[in-house]
């Protein structure tokens, strides 16, 4: 809970298992799961039968939001302000509970609207979703970008995971900080 994660994946891997695990755990805890992806993507195909998962399917075939099914809404791929609005409404709909958001894929966004717009969108999204009760995972195809683009996007995340053909490998996770109470409990009194 409370992490913003960049999941860099090899498209030949079974990276969707990481998303399935996140969704399964969240649903077991009765937490909402919101996934931004393309219809027919690997993630969409693997989780679309889960009616409790809300999909926002990004496409160039609509210019305004359009309800597709009970748990699927079509959104224009190039309308990042609308995506930010959906993030905002999701947060407002669940003001007290934990929220799980998956954004698949940053690579599609970079290739569709360009890197600068994607980076601006990401800065706003990461700030908006920064809360200890939100778990947010953004996916990036490791083979789709030059090193400068990858490095810039990585810089927005303190938690980075790589999922290759051999499975999941943690790249960068911050050290766990002890709470002040735990620190005080272990220290001698009266200094």
Model-derived features: positions:
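Glycine-rich P-loop/Walker A and Walker A-like loops and their local beta1-loop-alpha1 context
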Residues: 1-45
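Short acidic, S/G/P-rich loop/turn micro-motifs used as interaction or catalytic elements
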Residues: 11-15, 40-42, 62, 107-115, ...
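Short, structured coil segments at secondary-structure junctions
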Residues: 29, 49-51, 155-157
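Short, hydrophobic beta-strand segments that form beta-sheet elements in well-ordered domains
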Residues: 32-38, 54-58, 138-140
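Nucleotide-state-sensitive switch-loop elements of NTP-binding domains
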Residues: 41-74
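Phosphate-binding/switch loop-helix module in NTP-utilizing enzymes
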Residues: 65-126
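Substrate-engagement module of ASCE P-loop NTPases
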Residues: 117-144
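Phosphate-binding/switch region of NTP-binding enzymes
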Residues: 134, 140-191
């Amino acid at each position: 809970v409370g992490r913003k994660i960049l999941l860099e994946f090899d498209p030949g891997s079974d990276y969707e298992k990481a998303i399935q695990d996140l969704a399964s755990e969240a649903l077991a805890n009765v937490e909402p799961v919101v996934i931004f992806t393309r219809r027919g993507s690997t993630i969409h195909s693997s989780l679309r039968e889960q009616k409790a998962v809300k999909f926002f399917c990004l496409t160039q075939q609509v210019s305004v939001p359009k309800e597709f099914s009970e748990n699927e809404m079509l959104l224009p791929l190039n309308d990042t302000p609308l995506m930010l609005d959906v993030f905002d409404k999701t947060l407002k709909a669940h003001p007290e509970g934990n929220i799980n958001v998956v954004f698949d894929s940053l690579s599609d966004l970079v290739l569709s609207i360009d890197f600068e717009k994607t980076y601006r969108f990401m800065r706003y999204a990461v700030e908006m979703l920064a809360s200890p009760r939100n778990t947010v995972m953004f996916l990036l195809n490791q083979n789709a970008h030059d090193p400068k683009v990858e490095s810039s996007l990585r810089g927005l995340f303190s938690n980075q995971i790589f999922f290759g053909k051999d499975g999941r490998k943690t790249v960068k996770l911050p050290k766990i900080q002890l709470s002040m109470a735990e620190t005080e409990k272990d220290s001698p009194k009266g200094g």
